[in-house]
Amino acid sequence: MTIRLNKVTRDLNVGIATVVEFLQKKGYTVEANPNTKITEEQYAMLVKEFSTDKNLRLESERFIQERQNKDRNKASVSIDGYDKKEPEKTVADDVIKTVIPEDVRPKFKPVGKIDLDKLNRKVEKEPVKEEPKPQPVAAEEKKVAEEVKPVVNEVKKEEVTVTPATSEPKPVKEEPKPVVVEKPVETEKKVVEEVKKEEPKVVVSPEKTEKKEEKPVAEAPVTPVEKEEEGVFKIRPTEFVSKINVIGQIDLAALNQSTRPKKKSKEEKRKEREEKEKLRQDQKKQMKEAIIKEIRKEDSKQAKVVGKENLDPNGKKKRNRINNNKEKVDVNNVASNFAHPTPNSERTNNNRGGNQQGGGGQNRNRNNNNKDRFKKPVVKQEVSEEDVAKQVKETLARLTSKGKNKGAKYRKEKRDMASNRMQELEDQEMAESKVLKLTEFVTANELASMMNVSVNQVIGTCMSIGMMVSINQRLDAETINLVAEEFGFKTEYVSAEVAQAIVEEEDAPEDLEHRAPIVTVMGHVDHGKTSLLDYIRKANVIAGEAGGITQHIGAYHVTLEDGRKITFLDTPGHEAFTAMRARGAKVTDIAIIIVAADDDVMPQTKEAINHAAAAGVPIVFAINKIDKPHANPEKIKETLAQMNYLVEEWGGKYQSQDISAKKGLGVPELMEKVLLEAEMLDLKANPNRNATGSIIESTLDKGRGYVATVLVSNGTLKVGDIVLAGTSYGRVKAMFNERNQRVAQAGPSEPVLILGLNGAPAAGDTFHVIETDQEAREIANKREQLQREQGLRTQKLLTLDEVGRRIALGNFQELNVIVKGDVDGSIEALSDSLIKLSTEQIQVNVIHKAVGQISESDVTLAAASDAIIIGFQVRPSASARKFAEQEGVDIRLYSVIYAAIEEVKAAMEGMLAPEVKEVVTATIEVREVFHITKVGTVAGAVVKEGKVKRSDKARLIRDGIVIFSGSINALKRFKDDVKEVGTNFECGISLVNYNDLKVGDMIETYEEVEVKQTL
């Protein structure tokens, strides 16, 4: 089953370009067309990759649905709550007007609930009894109150539960209050009796029931309450109408304080709203000046306020409307889009229709009613008799939102202001800088998105310079520069490493602790770097190195006698390891430059000084071998002074120390100076965080897999951490120190050997501890992809120009080399040295380089590409050796880098065609010419100089011009054939295929000698 691309993008909440790019990475070519169909397998891959986007989309839809449901529930709940509290307001209004006499009189017939109402009122009216107009009645009321007090609470409860019923019971409640005071004693007695009858049913602990107001919604108690209330009405209003007014005023004030004021003064509320809105207008006008985006919102709110002002003066409606439309039509549209898109857009359309259809008063009214959204409550109040529920919902929502969200709304506006300001600042910075930070081979689509232009414009620009590019084609640096310049951008290239770097966390100053300094020992070959470390470590390091030369960067953690710690990096000295030395200077804090006192400041020493200076590393000079008889430390200091490196003894800023690494002279003083420099630097690190640091070396160990020497620069590296270094990653399975002792963790400035990486990272790569294995894998894969693409792009392909150059040279040769070594740094150094050997005639190509022993796959590659295999401190496996013998592949093994370079150079010289030189052997003068039948012309001649041989070649010279070149046919002395004739001897000589010899000609004989070419 196939699925269309547009359905996939909707389901997974991603763009078509993203889907197409992902499938292309997986090896599927898919057209970027919404109607393109993909297979189930491809769909499954997409679901696996982009399931998070899909889940986010579903989650957001679910959240929106829940919020809509909540809004609906709130609306219905607010109505119920409103009915419980608010109907008293509307009832009060009705009672005041005229509804009382019509509804109350028919309900007067049954006598029953008078007492309940009385009780309610009496409990509240106990203070009112201070006005003793009818004295006897007051005394009786007290008795009734004492008897029925426990029931009063419950009656209130029942009334609350009854609230969902119509507003009729509530007028009943309000009238009985005044009547209760002056009822005849007989009716009161009857009521008391009825109440007593009902008491056993309802009388429970009143305090408990008060808490559970909403639960007892029994129908049985409701009906008797209604009957009793009806009875109350009958008796009271007819007999005492005048006195109702006096007592009723007190009750209304006491009961309806919380609810009445809201509905009593709707006009006052409007005035208050208008005043508040005017205040908001003033605030918003100030905001306008600061923020452009706020203007639309403020204008829309101003428009609403202006509309309300226009409602009152009818005469000015027309003029105001015209002015408002001129100024604020767009603002209303914008506001409608921002606030309530669907309903308001419809209303704005209706408004337009009303305005356009005619100029009568009806149209004016329509326009004014619909113009302002906040006036809808007013319209609904007019129709409130028809649709009470909607009015309640709208009014309550408006009132509650004003009470609750007033502060929240203000805070939100402040937040919006701040965020908008920040956004504008960012936009300005972007506009000012216009610098694109990118890697070299980005796609046309990515470049377009970075410049915020359409990809079609980028493709069009490329076509205008004669390049046909597709949307996902990667562009080289030159093209990117051209396109970016066309759109007014500058480009700044960052490597793939930088682009994919992990965000560094900044450490708080209180978390930092002092760490040991990392000291690099640099200098020329055999000037005593390792001997110095040897003395400091009290161990013979040199014994393990081939030829006594340090091949790898050694990292050592040393604890001095006073307990202070220093980490040393011992870098190789000879020029092949320039890259390694540069890397060592990058991770170091202090550099010790060693110079032998019996030698001079060598080129490698100068290079080491330059590396340290370029890295901004403090330098301490150690002048070694002062115990030798011919040592001259002052000469070294003089040479350094000529290089602008004045030591402290000569008034400069660089510390120096005369030492003897073998005997230990001056070494403690040197350590003091190093530690002094370290104190000046105030080196600190945070051990309580994920580790970061540098890869010093990496190698493939047959028993342990890929092993990397790392130097922790910050944090603490523990066994079990997930480490990402370059394109390699893995979980740390074990850690060892430089003495091969297992350790559990390594803090800042500690070098350790780690096991568990899935490859050999390049020496000098930075490593980071990542939280999850998945994240590390993703970053490593992306880096590897960029590295591979970079390699493919930079691979020099054979062009016609190159072919022409080779033909012109005539004898062009290529030497393909495969380099295998024990550690990454040595492989890199050897490869660079071999590539430097290339000349115009012979090009050296390192087609493959890797860590580990020579395998069968290396031999296969060498056989296919006519390459030789160079192994540096590694050996081929048994199967690889046999395979190489069968295929005739040359495997050369070395343990010292110089030997490898020299032999390759010799092999290259052997590949060159030997140069042919002519060596003149003799000069012969022709004295006589003899014409002999069947033989030809023979010259009688004398050898003027040299020795002529029978095998030599000859050329005939007449008057200084070469007439003929050929070989000697016969050489005779008297009648005998001879092999050679010496100087001043006569001889007979004839030339092959040439008879025009004349007296006085000169014959020059020569031989061709092949001279071996050198590079």
From Swiss-Prot:
<feature type="region of interest" description="Disordered">
    <location>
        <begin position="124"/>
        <end position="144"/>
    </location>
</feature>
<feature type="domain" description="tr-type G">
    <location>
        <begin position="514"/>
        <end position="684"/>
    </location>
</feature>
<dbReference type="Pfam" id="PF11987">
    <property type="entry name" value="IF-2"/>
</dbReference>
<dbReference type="InterPro" id="IPR053905">
    <property type="entry name" value="EF-G-like_DII"/>
</dbReference>
<dbReference type="InterPro" id="IPR044145">
    <property type="entry name" value="IF2_II"/>
</dbReference>
<protein>
    <recommendedName>
        <fullName>Translation initiation factor IF-2</fullName>
    </recommendedName>
</protein>
<keyword id="KW-0963">Cytoplasm</keyword>
<feature type="region of interest" description="G4">
    <location>
        <begin position="624"/>
        <end position="627"/>
    </location>
</feature>
<comment type="similarity">
    <text>Belongs to the TRAFAC class translation factor GTPase superfamily. Classic translation factor GTPase family. IF-2 subfamily.</text>
</comment>
<dbReference type="GO" id="GO:0003924">
    <property type="term" value="F:GTPase activity"/>
</dbReference>
<feature type="binding site">
    <location>
        <begin position="570"/>
        <end position="574"/>
    </location>
    <ligand>
        <name>GTP</name>
    </ligand>
</feature>
<feature type="region of interest" description="Disordered">
    <location>
        <begin position="250"/>
        <end position="386"/>
    </location>
</feature>
<dbReference type="Pfam" id="PF22042">
    <property type="entry name" value="EF-G_D2"/>
</dbReference>
<feature type="binding site">
    <location>
        <begin position="624"/>
        <end position="627"/>
    </location>
    <ligand>
        <name>GTP</name>
    </ligand>
</feature>
<dbReference type="Pfam" id="PF04760">
    <property type="entry name" value="IF2_N"/>
</dbReference>
<feature type="binding site">
    <location>
        <begin position="523"/>
        <end position="530"/>
    </location>
    <ligand>
        <name>GTP</name>
    </ligand>
</feature>
<dbReference type="InterPro" id="IPR000795">
    <property type="entry name" value="T_Tr_GTP-bd_dom"/>
</dbReference>
<feature type="region of interest" description="G5">
    <location>
        <begin position="660"/>
        <end position="662"/>
    </location>
</feature>
<keyword id="KW-0342">GTP-binding</keyword>
<dbReference type="InterPro" id="IPR009000">
    <property type="entry name" value="Transl_B-barrel_sf"/>
</dbReference>
<dbReference type="GO" id="GO:0003743">
    <property type="term" value="F:translation initiation factor activity"/>
</dbReference>
<dbReference type="InterPro" id="IPR005225">
    <property type="entry name" value="Small_GTP-bd"/>
</dbReference>
<keyword id="KW-0547">Nucleotide-binding</keyword>
<dbReference type="InterPro" id="IPR000178">
    <property type="entry name" value="TF_IF2_bacterial-like"/>
</dbReference>
<keyword id="KW-0648">Protein biosynthesis</keyword>
<dbReference type="InterPro" id="IPR027417">
    <property type="entry name" value="P-loop_NTPase"/>
</dbReference>
<comment type="function">
    <text>One of the essential components for the initiation of protein synthesis. Protects formylmethionyl-tRNA from spontaneous hydrolysis and promotes its binding to the 30S ribosomal subunits. Also involved in the hydrolysis of GTP during the formation of the 70S ribosomal complex.</text>
</comment>
<feature type="compositionally biased region" description="Basic and acidic residues">
    <location>
        <begin position="196"/>
        <end position="217"/>
    </location>
</feature>
<dbReference type="InterPro" id="IPR023115">
    <property type="entry name" value="TIF_IF2_dom3"/>
</dbReference>
<feature type="region of interest" description="G1">
    <location>
        <begin position="523"/>
        <end position="530"/>
    </location>
</feature>
<feature type="region of interest" description="Disordered">
    <location>
        <begin position="159"/>
        <end position="179"/>
    </location>
</feature>
<dbReference type="GO" id="GO:0005737">
    <property type="term" value="C:cytoplasm"/>
</dbReference>
<dbReference type="Pfam" id="PF00009">
    <property type="entry name" value="GTP_EFTU"/>
</dbReference>
<dbReference type="InterPro" id="IPR006847">
    <property type="entry name" value="IF2_N"/>
</dbReference>
<dbReference type="InterPro" id="IPR015760">
    <property type="entry name" value="TIF_IF2"/>
</dbReference>
<feature type="region of interest" description="G2">
    <location>
        <begin position="548"/>
        <end position="552"/>
    </location>
</feature>
<dbReference type="InterPro" id="IPR036925">
    <property type="entry name" value="TIF_IF2_dom3_sf"/>
</dbReference>
<dbReference type="GO" id="GO:0005525">
    <property type="term" value="F:GTP binding"/>
</dbReference>
<feature type="compositionally biased region" description="Basic and acidic residues">
    <location>
        <begin position="265"/>
        <end position="315"/>
    </location>
</feature>
<feature type="region of interest" description="Disordered">
    <location>
        <begin position="196"/>
        <end position="230"/>
    </location>
</feature>
<keyword id="KW-0396">Initiation factor</keyword>
<feature type="region of interest" description="G3">
    <location>
        <begin position="570"/>
        <end position="573"/>
    </location>
</feature>
